[in-house]
Amino acid sequence: MTALYWEDIQIGTRRDLGGYTFSEAEIIRFAKKYDPQVFHVDPEAAKQSIFGGLIASGWHTAAVWMKLSLAEREASKGTTPLMRAGVSPGFEDMRWIKPVRPGMTLRFSSEVCGKQELRSRPELGL
């Protein structure tokens, strides 16, 4: 696998991670385990919620992004130079703009929006 070095990383570089369709059963299964709010777990009760129906947990959509990101990275090994992956420093601005309903397909991507050197770990950057 060819490594991608700090100076090679270009702001604006975008990677398509593919699409994912959220099924009702999967939305309910995820939410029952991790985010059991009524509008995620009960289609009938969800009709009375502010969303007017069942929606996926935002954490479900984030988990799907992570799954697709790792799958795309694995599929790219040996064919595309990759950035070294490490522990995430967290998120500053994660928002869920629109509800994700059963049957919806979302397309996911990642984009390099900036770069930051780490003084404490000169071999790494964000």
Region annotations inferred by a language model:
Residues V87, F91-L126:
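Hydrophobic beta-sheet segments that form the core/acyl-binding groove
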